[in-house]
Amino acid sequence: MRVSSVDSLLTNNNITIDEQLVKNDDNFEKTVDMLEKFKGNLFNWYSTEDCTVLEPRFISTVDSGNFLCSLTALKEGLKEYYSECPSLAETVAKIEEIIANTDLACLYNRRRKLFHIGIYPDTCEKSKSFYDLYMSESRLTSYFAVANRIVPKNHWSSLGRIFVGGGRRCGLVSWTGTMFEYFMPCLFLPSPEGSVSYESLRFCLQNQRSRAGRKPFGISESGFYA
């Protein structure tokens, strides 16, 4: 089980409640509580059989950020149902406790003003690589960290913004040009029409379509490295 699967579960929980498909329960809280963590951060991989951490024992910065954003979306969604189910306040309080106890700052490099890719908790060795581009799946983590004053505001301006042209459009580059890097943060972050993010998304979409021709388009992580 990857921590990103937990993120999806939390987001889907909101949807199923909205659609009245299932009732909210606190099983996820109990599961998160029992999982081994490092400074509140979930490890990248857990066994689906006994929830023990799988090798390599690694904390992913972007997955931790996605987890926190998913929790935030869930708790704000649950607040809409207080009138129907007052006991949800206890669930929200527990979620807020989980968020407060998750230390993103341990993944941040103040000298570089950037987040490391991750950390190996057993040795406290941080990755030598950084999330240094704005157009990346990590911009969700960066936004959350700045908005919650976990890192300084100048981190946002430290993210690289390199423009390139292609076809009739131009936009910011990502490291591998995948749909995941460009579009994943849109699950939570708006990209207003005319903004750099909006134009970069259209730039990415145009190039993905152009490259595929008449074939299905949309290169993402799994397809890119296959």
Residue ranges and their predicted role:
Residues 1-226:
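Ser/Thr/Asn(+Pro)-rich, low-complexity disordered segments
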